[in-house]
Structure formats: C-alpha cells, structure tokens
Amino acid sequence: MGSLNHWISEIRRPRGETINARKIKSNRYGKYQRIKYYILLLFLAAALLGSLQIGLLDPLSLLARSIGTAVLPTIHTAALGLLSWVKELGLPILATAAQSTYDLLGSLLLPYRQAHFHGILIIGGFFLTVLILNRLITRFWCRAICPLGALLGLFSRWTLFGLEKDEVTCNHCNQCLIACQGADGPDVGVVWRQPECHLCLNCQAVCPQSSLKFKFYPQQTVTTANPAGTQKVDVSRRAVMASLASGVVLVPLLRSGDAFEVNSDPRLIRPPGSLPESQFVERCIRCGQCMRVCPNNALHPTMLQAGAEGIWSPVLIPRIGYCEPTCTLCGQVCPTGAIAELSLVRKVGNETVPPNRIGTAFIDRGRCLPWAMAIPCIVCEEWCPTSPKAVYFSEETVVDRKKDEVKVKRPSVDPQLCTGCGACEYACPVTDRAAIYITSVGESRSKRNQLLLKTRNMSNPRDETS
C-alpha cells in the first residue's frame, strides 16, 4: 500500500524552482501527521472491547478489499468493452488483434469469469480518494491516516538504525526535503522525527555533500535547535485520552442499533462456517478475501444490513450466486477465523454429521408459477443439490382461466433437508424477484435463529448459545 501511494505521489511530477519550493513546504513536518496515532488508539481501544473495526483502515485489508472488489472488476469491464469495440469496427486485422489480445490477457491477467460486487462505488470511491490525496501531499495516506504506520512509529523508539547529520558539511540546499517521503525533518538544524521516517534513504542518496548517513547507533548532534537529537512521537495527551475514550464508546454505540440483534435483516446470510453474529463482526477485518475467492460470486460486502459494526463484511446474495455445496474456499482464506475452515464432511454432512446450514428456502406462492398461475415449472427442484432433495412436489390438477384442467407440480420445501445454499433462488425463472428465496433462519451458527425454538432464555435474549 505504501509503495502504491509513493508511485501515485511521484508519477509525472513537474520540475522547476516553484515546484521544488512547494515540495519543500509540504515535506516539512505538519501537525496533521498526528492524526494516524489518534486513529490507531481509537481502534486499539475498540479492539480491546472485542471489535476489529481497524480492518476498515488497515492498509492490507484496504488494499485487498479495494483491488478485489472494485479495481479488478473495473479493469476487466473496461478492457472487455474496449476490445469488443475494436472487434466490432469491422476491420479483420483489428478484430484478429483484439481477439488475440483478449486471449492473452485472459490467460495471464483477466479471470475466466469476472465477479462483480455490491457497493463498489463507495469502496472504489474511498480508495480513489486516498490515491488522489497523495497527489496533493506526498504519501498523505502514510503520513496522516495509516494505523499500521502509526504502530510502527510507536515501536521506532527502540530502533538501532537511524539518521546521522553532519552540520559542518551541510550547505542547506534542501535537496533532502525535496526527496523526503515522510516529512520527518531530514535537513540539518531541525529535529529528526524518527517515528515519521519511512527509511526510503532518499535524503542520503540526493545529498551532494554526503551530510546525511543512515547507520547503526548513529551519533545525534545536540544543538540549541535540536536539544534531544531525535523527536519521539508527537501527540497531545488530551487528544490521546479523547481517542481512547472514543474507542471505548464506539463499540456499545455501534451495537446499540436495532440491526445488530433485535431487528436483524433476515436476508443477512453469512458464509458457511461463520461464527455467531456477535463473534463474527468482532473478528472480521473486511479484507474481502472470501468475496474474491468465491467461485460463484455469491459473497458481497454489506452496507448497513448488519448494522454499522458489520459494514463491508461478507453477505451471501443468492440471486447473484449460490453457495457451491462442495466449496470451502471462504473458510480456507479467512485470516482471522471469522469463517471457520470446514471439511467437506462438515459442509455437506453424512449419516452421523448434519450439514452446515446458512439459511432456509421459502416459497412465495403469489409469485411461484405453478402456485399462482398454473404454469408448469420444476426449476427449483432440479437445481436443489441436497440428497434427498429439499424441494419436493405435490402433483395437483387445477383449472385454468379457460376452464381446462392442468396438471402442475407445486413445490414445497423440507426445512430439515434445506441448507440454504440459494441454488433454487439463483435459478428461479421469475427474473425480477425470485418466487423462492432464502433467509438466514435455520442457520447452524445460531441456536436462536431457528424456525422452531425448543427453549429460549428470556433473561438473556441476546444469548445465541442458549
């Protein structure tokens, strides 16, 4: 992520005295660089209370999520549109070249079937905003926002490697400031801010007098302007306390909304193997790896279906893609255990082990073709992957509008066999809103979210394990 920000910052930078003066000014330390430490402290306080909201701004999660759900689909769509346009120009040479280019890109870069995701305008827009800000201030993300950079800055006080300045040979040409990536004060006569340094070594490389050297156990020149030699993390005690308090308040605030438990969205279908909802949102870091690896494009980032705490966590949307019965990839790639890695036996079940259920199918008889319009249709039963099938028929003879008798097979669902994979909803020929749909009720991860509850602990209605 830092390398990408650096590349965006430096691409096609104009040269000249005016531009250099601007770079010198922007590369001096600014108070805005404190913000990342306050962000880190806020998220750390929230993490101590069991909420990994830091995944929203963690650079690894941010990069993986943005590339997988927004950047690659956009590139694929643009490339396919451009090559299709060239191919349709009617020129045989261009058409052949376009087809060859597409075949080459398809074998090296482009996926066989590009997935597309919900909410990429917000995810992609946020990522694009971060990149654009780097054009205004070099490495703005790293300097002002990145919580990982702030964490590394806190640990930098114990580093053995640092910058040594030679005030005697320095001619104050400011080349070091022009090349500096971290605004850490590499020039002689000012405090070198060790926590802000990215160790790019640019200042040492461009110094014409060799006045700057990075070495182990550097000798720090103590002067009136620089009495301590180096400067530790520059934060306000009052702001630190405010950040910690905000993190402590953030968790109950996020969970106080009705979407978290008492009025959860019935279409909030989590991936197979997911932990109970309260534990799931605590562990999920929104990296998007499960969405990227899903072969049927079934997993998508949520917005507010899971409440504010669950934003950008994965949800299965059967109308777009169903859960492949023998696939356990999402659990294999999950880095935090929010989605458990299931064996094939635990996923599909056998005589002694029940299958992992993520929901239950329901039939909307007002939209189902055999039920509502006496039109024969058996698609949902054909697509049902369970054995025996969870969708079964009752053959009935009905009278249509012309007073003719029509034999139709009307589907029903056996909730004891349905795993909620969504194949029936995905394949339903009622195109706008499927006549058979999945909700999360009956999911294996929750003992409360069931069709028929044997007992319920009314003293603790939020208890999912009772």
Language-model regions, residue ranges each:
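Non-ligating segments of multi-cofactor redox enzymes
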Residues: 1-466
